[in-house]
Curated annotation (Swiss-Prot):
Residue ranges, compositional bias (Low complexity): 178-199, 307-323, 398-415
The organism of origin for this protein: Kluyveromyces lactis (strain ATCC 8585 / CBS 2359 / DSM 70799 / NBRC 1267 / NRRL Y-1140 / WM37)
Family: Belongs to the MSS11 family.
Feature: compositional bias, Basic and acidic residues: 16-30
Keyword Repeat: no
UniProt feature, compositional bias: Polar residues: 200-220, 230-246, 260-294, 423-452, 501-517
Gene: MSS11
Record GO cellular component, one term: cytoplasm
Source organism, top-level taxon: Eukaryota
GO BP annotations, alphabetical order: regulation of biosynthetic process
Name of this chain's protein: Transcription activator MSS11
Amino acid sequence: MAGPGARKSNASNTPQDKKMKGDSIQDQKNKQYNSGDVVEPFVSDAMAKNSKQLLYAHIYNYLVHNQHHDTAKKFLQEANVPLSKAVPQHSLNGDKLLNSKMLMNSPDTFLFEWWQSLWALNQYVETTPIENLTSLKPFNDRIVPILPQVPPQEMLSRVVRTGPIAPAMGFAGNIVPQQQQQQQQQQQQQLQQQQQQQQHFRTMTSPGSGNTPYATNANSFPAGVRVPQPQGSFQPVLGTTPNAGTNAGLGVNPYHAATLGSSKSTPKPQNTSVGSKNKQTKKSSATNKDSGANTKPRANGESKQFKGVNSSSKVKKPSPSGSQQVQANWTKLQQKQQQQQQQQQQQQQQQQQQQQQQQQHQQQQQHQQQQQHQQQQQHQQQQQQIRMQYQKMMTLMQHQQNQQNQQHHQLGNQNILPGQGDPSDNSSPSQQYLQQQRAYENMVKSQQQDQPMNKDHFAMSLQTQQPQSFDSYAMPATMGPQASSQPLDNNKKSEPLSKIDVTNNQDFNTFSGGSNNKLNFGQFDMSGLGNEFMGGRKQ
């Protein structure tokens, strides 16, 4: 049987009851949007079952708020938007819009506000120079954890309340100077963190087994405990192991206030000793001597340690904390992005240079082609000019040759004697005369063959004469004037007929001793030749 002090089990504290209570609370929240009075369903983020439906609800609310009605209808039909009550999918045919009631909402919709905040953060990171981000003070200063602190007055009051501890260290009711208080306040935060890390090293041992030179009292560690130095980034400072001096000057550790409170109820070392009073007095005097002997070297050691702390704080820096590592990673990422951007810019510049070189090469080729085309045109023009000049020269040469031929023809015609015509003209009377003369010679030859015995002096003279060329100016002795032995000058004009002695010429119709009737020249009428060839040339 259970006693009267036994508790009765509360049915409301069971897990099942808690779950039912949570469901009822959720139902109460949804009732304000899913009441029975509302006939048509509506879109609400309170009915979202997962993050995707929550996003769909806010997207739909954003579209309706900004009057994108067609897009909202299509989105309501295609997306799984959370509704206040179950509706068949075929009923959402895209003809009507549903109202939206959102728990998380704002004047410009929650989706827009959320995106605006992200965009502002992104713009700040993009527009702020990297130097300003890396030179922020919180990332470079020493980070000291914020711990509960005890005001100096309370610490002094606690020190005074300890009783025999203060006179043992020589602080008999004296006030600590201000300089020491400032130094103690600066070191208090470091001591609190170190003491928190050293809690697992604090164990109780026998008083005689320790080698530490520090004095012991009711509020200090046991003499046998050696406190190791912390392995953190902070430098060792005075008072790593609490003792009478530290308790007197720095106050009571706030984490061990309970031990101090319990020390009042616990018997003091003088009351707990079992031996005689003499032994107790000897022991107390020994402890006082040890404490007095230890105060002097510790004072010197404190000054040295303070110097070491100040110097080390200037030289050594704390190890990077989590925020510094994040900042370092951020700077590395920014540097990588800058390097990538620089590489991309270099690649773009190289591509632009290549394109410019290609364009220059194409322009040079086009210029060369134009020059070649111009040279070809010039060459063709020169050839045409040369041909035209050659044709002109040929025409001039032909014209000059024709003129020379005409002049030569004229000069040759001037040297023709009277009675001779132009030898090139076959139709002239002179040519007819020569033909008649040849016909006559042929006739004479035929008569000589028929009558060899009948000799004719005129015929004999004709046979002895050689045929002369048309250009010869010598006349036979029997015809006209006798030829002289001197050669005729071609450039010399023929003498006029007035100077010719006509008396020496014989009549062609009457010859002496001509007995043959065929030799009568009456049939060759040459009376008209005198007028045509009187000047040696056809008029």
